[in-house]
Amino acid sequence: MTESGGSDMGMAGAGAAATAFDGSVLEANPAGMARLPGTTITVAAVPALVQLDFKGSATTPGSAHNHEGPKLTGSAFAVQSFSGLSLGLGLYSYTGLGADFGDEWVGRRVIEHEQLRSLNIAPAVAYQVTDHLQFGGTLRAQYVEVEASLAVNNSAALYGPPAGLPDGQVSLQGHSWSPGGDLGIAYQPRPDVELGLAWTSAVHHTVDFDVTAAGLHPVLGAILPQALPVSLSLTLPQQVAASGAWQATPATTLAATARWQEWSTLGEARQMSGLGDRPMFPQGLRDTWGASLGVRHRLPDGTRLSAGVAYDSDPSREGTMPAYFPSSSQLRLALGGEWPAREDLTVRLALSVIQQGEVRVAQLGHPLPLPGVGPLSGTFPASRFYFAALAVDFRR
């Protein structure tokens, strides 16, 4: 997620590692904190909506729609700068969102509802080495919460009588805390040019699940304890981002960012249970790259308007994804506006719309190897994600 509510959100992340417009620079490149004078506090509310549909194939016909409504995320950053030294604290999400396809769709035995939430608590420090060069870093405590629910086949053909039972339900919920960090460098070779390079570390999590079940066939109810305990081992990817910004005129800034993310490490995620150790991504994932271009313009009354476009490549290795991870290439369009409510307070609005490419599903099994899951094939046609932001910056 690049939508943390900072000024760079209205530029689709362009220039994020090079500029220092507000407190969210702590997340994008902690070195930029050294360019924020005095005290800076940034608080943002970021509602998100996912429009996602599934269309089955001839072998597994049917359709589904994501019934999950808008979700509210947010962030908060505080930076205090002294003589050559800046200290900060950030609270923000790294990745998240989820989907709810209901209990009637053809893939209900693969996934009905899923949710991934994350929170970073990140103390940070930055140092002004020279008038043109800054270094910075954070040490993050990252919290991840995972929820999933799926239907379970109660067919008498699998377990014997009684026959005619509806599907049962299995739900998993767990969380994990793990450390991570960020390093960054910012450099201004001349007054109208800003450059930045930032690294975000990978973070490994082992999520131990609480498993609950309801409505199971008596035989399956006796077998299920053999599957316990259930856990998920995953690594959220590291990232490297390089940004530049050019003050083309006294009122206009042009910016760009190039980034690389190591999604192949997430592709090694595995689910462990008493029934075995299985990959979440049998075909793995591949690393992705992305690029952003943006512009920011100041009007005579102090209002600032921004716009940006970004592209991120497809993480699938063989062109297909599991139904519980419908991710593909993404095109991001963004707009933003900032208004000086008073000398020490700025109000910001931003909108980011992500157009995601088609996702093909060709799933033969499930990481939780319960009987009767069956294959699932079809597509998630081009989908859209919407992020809005209402943020305030306080400076003193």
Feature-to-residue mapping (PLM):
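Transmembrane beta-strand segments of Gram-negative outer membrane beta-barrel proteins
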Residues: M1-G15, A34-L52
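Outer-membrane beta-barrel porins/channels
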Residues: M1-S4, D8-M9, T59-G62, K71-S75, ...
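Surface-exposed strand-loop-strand hairpins of Gram-negative outer-membrane beta-barrel proteins
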Residues: G10-F21, V50-G69
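Outer-membrane beta-barrel pore proteins
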Residues: G15-F21, L26-T39, A78-G84, G96
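Intrinsic-disorder/low-complexity, polar/charged segments
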Residues: N29, F54-G56, T249
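Long, well-ordered hydrophobic secondary-structure segments characteristic of membrane-embedded
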Residues: V43-L52, N66-Q80
